Amino acid sequence: MHILVVSVNYRTAPVEFREKLTFQAAELERAMTTLQNQKSVLENVIVSTCNRTEIYAVVDQLHTGRYYIKKFLADWFQLEIEEVAPYLTIFEQDGAIDHLFRVTCGLDSMVVGETQILGQIKDSFLEAQQVKATGTIFNELFKQVITLAKRAHSETTIGESAMSVSYAAVELGKKIFGELTDCHVLILGAGKMGELALQNLYGSGARKVTVMNRTLSKAEVMAEKYMGHAKPLSELQCALLEADILISSTGASDYVITKEMMTKVEKMRSGRPLFMVDIAVPRDIDPAIDELEGSFLYDIDDLQGVVEANRAERLKEAEKIQFMIEEEIVLFKTWLSTLGVVPLISALRDKALAIQSETMESLERKIPNLSDRERKVISKHTKSIINQLLKDPILVAKEIAAEEGADEKLALFAKIFDLEMEDVESRAEEVEHKRAWTPSVPSL
């Protein structure tokens, strides 16, 4: 079994390409189900955000797994593998495990230490569980990763100086306008990104706020929380006439604001500038609008400069979290190494229980007048003796499994206890067969 990550992210691909490889929320479960049926893929979780699309997979062979995951991405987005490959980063084994920990803890984010990615990873994992795309390995790994990420944010101050991308957009607006009290702010999109932007705007003094969304009721709910106004998207052109700051994150598949629309709006704005931030992927605003004299457009990649402002302080805390990650990886790898010894332990227990059962049958033949209570007491105590005798050998077997040359040592272990290796290997095959269909872990 091998753990593999295939990543397209803000470090390796511009937004123009990332938006071509973005899974919509509604299609994520279908995508993971499709990927699960690909050759070599045993488990998978797909994470798709504005800054990254990543496939986490357990595969039976690294080379085969890499190829079929690349092919899946290309086929799904109707591209050629040659078009996709230059933008992919691939992590394998320890590197893949470390990458997942770092991403979930916010250490690989554009804004180091942001917490939004933790929720996105958790949501993707739970969706993968629902479609039975995860098994023994990922159920354990993702549970461990999510738990550590929560602990990292509670035990360090990285979140205090960290910013989400939406917060970075607000900071950029403050640098341009100074105080936001008198600015008319227009929010397009009532999703998580839009609400995060509105929270930060409100916290920075903005009070003239309009929220627009395709579903007006959602815009009304969000606007009411922050004493703003809600309008339907059909009134967008009029709203653009009044706005000073526009932050857009609708999740639409096409441009919500076109250059043609903005050209008409500019003529009626009497030279007033409009600061526009597009934090959607795919983008909501036609990038050609930046050519217009009165429109100042920034997309998600342009926010990198704002993000750097608090970077030094966050990196100090990131070092602490990286140390926590390394400790956790050791624990996971130790657990992973013991999976191979499970069939051996199972065979040892079964042999011991068979001896106990034969002993009880012999005892009952020799002492036929035992009461039910006496049988239960004797059975309980003989099983207790077995458990105590097996406790140390089982611990030793688990320790051996984590050492170099484990196969030879475990073979000797099996020989000492006269265990049939064919039986052990048969049990191992059953474990591998069932691994991808392990019941979901409890909700995190």
From Swiss-Prot:
Residues annotated as catalytic: C50 (nucleophile)
Keyword Oxidoreductase: yes
EC number(s) from the headed UniProt entry: 1.2.1.70
First and last residue of the signal peptide: none
InterPro entries: 4pyrrol_synth_GluRdtase, 4pyrrol_synth_GluRdtase_dimer, 4pyrrol_synth_GluRdtase_N, GluRdtase_CS, GluRdtase_dimer_dom_sf, GluRdtase_N_sf, NAD(P)-bd_dom_sf, Shikm_DH/Glu-tRNA_Rdtase
Pfam families referenced in this protein's UniProt entry, alphabetically: GlutR_dimer, GlutR_N, Shikimate_DH
Keywords: NADP, Oxidoreductase, Porphyrin biosynthesis
Reaction(s) the record says it catalyses: (S)-4-amino-5-oxopentanoate + tRNA(Glu) + NADP(+) = L-glutamyl-tRNA(Glu) + NADPH + H(+)
Gene Ontology biological process: protoporphyrinogen IX biosynthetic process
Site label Important for activity, positions: H99
Binding-site list for NADP(+): G189, A190, G191, K192, M193, G194
Residues at which substrate binds: T49, C50, N51, R52, S109, E114, T115, Q116, Q120
UniProt-listed Gene3D superfamilies: Glutamyl-tRNA reductase, N-terminal domain, NAD(P)-binding Rossmann-like Domain
Pathway: Porphyrin-containing compound metabolism; protoporphyrin-IX biosynthesis; 5-aminolevulinate from L-glutamyl-tRNA(Glu): step 1/2
GO molecular function: glutamyl-tRNA reductase activity; NADP binding
Keyword Transport included in the entry's annotation: no
Annotated domain remarks: Possesses an unusual extended V-shaped dimeric structure with each monomer consisting of three distinct domains arranged along a curved 'spinal' alpha-helix. The N-terminal catalytic domain specifically recognizes the glutamate moiety of the substrate. The second domain is the NADPH-binding domain, and the third C-terminal domain is responsible for dimerization.
Note: During catalysis, the active site Cys acts as a nucleophile attacking the alpha-carbonyl group of tRNA-bound glutamate with the formation of a thioester intermediate between enzyme and glutamate, and the concomitant release of tRNA(Glu). The thioester intermediate is finally reduced by direct hydride transfer from NADPH, to form the product GSA.
Record note on quaternary structure: Homodimer.
Known role: Catalyzes the NADPH-dependent reduction of glutamyl-tRNA(Glu) to glutamate 1-semialdehyde (GSA).
Family affiliation: Belongs to the glutamyl-tRNA reductase family.
Protein name (Swiss-Prot/TrEMBL): Glutamyl-tRNA reductase
Gene from which this protein is expressed: hemA
